[in-house]
Each structure stands twice: as C-alpha cells, then as structure tokens.
C-alpha cells in the first residue's frame, strides 16, 4: 500500500487504454498550458501599452512573466534613488504594488479590475546600482480580494525588500479607465 492508501498492484494493473487516455489528456493539458501562456503574454503586452505614461513606466518597471499565481518584474535602481544615492524605499513599494496588481488583475479576469487597498513593506538592505527583481506570489486569490507576497532582490539575489499587498477585485471598469483584460482595446 502506498502513502495514499492505494494498493500498488491495483494501481499498476491499469489497462493500457487508460495510459493512452492519460497521454491524450496530457497532450490536451499541454495545449491548454500553451493557450494560457499565450494569454499571459498578450496580457503583459496589453498592460505595457496601458501603462505608457504611468508611474510604473516612468520608473522603468518591466513585467517579464505573469499569471494570477506569480508575477515577475524588474526595475532599474538608476533614476529611482533617494538623496543618498540608494534605491528609494518608495520605489520598492511601487514595484511591489505594480507586480501584485498585475497578478490581481489576472485573478479578477476580463470586465473586472483590481485596486490596491493595503501595502506593507520591510526594507532589508540598501542597493546603489543595478537592477532589482520582484517576484509576487499569490497568498490568497478570491472573488473579491487577492493578496500577494512580493520578494525584491538585487542583482546578486540578496533580499532587498519584503512586501505584502492586498487588492480589492471590482466588477466594473472605473469611468475613464481601461479593462486590463481587454487586450484588443489596448492595441488601439
């Protein structure tokens, strides 16, 4: 008996047809994953277009990978420093909120939008040059809220900042706003 309580002989005696069916299902899963990857790439493109002229674009924030569960992005230190020549803590917060908000927008889906309602951050070390990378990982993805933990690291992989963001997921696009899930509108 394995750790799930199933008899090994019963499990291993599965007919070949079941294995073929599993292989076909795996192929379908692969195709579905490719479709999800394409949708995420289109979402990143659409968000980049919508972000032109916004604070994240002015700060050089670039999203490199995105799903509702995990978002990765980078930001240059140059241009985002405080008077002592170090990365500004507020810049780390903007990176954290930007990445978490992308994940929350993906969690919300088309026709809905995400707005940050709480952010907290702890700054662990100073950075004077290079690029920082943020990874937002979903802690909670519900119908009305989404929460992310964001780890920001320097070029050497050392933790610079730990942040936590909660977003409210709304049913309608705000007046004058854009639906981040509407990639076609972003291309216009």
Language model regions located:
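Terminal targeting signals and extreme-terminal segments of soluble enzymes
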Residues: 1-188
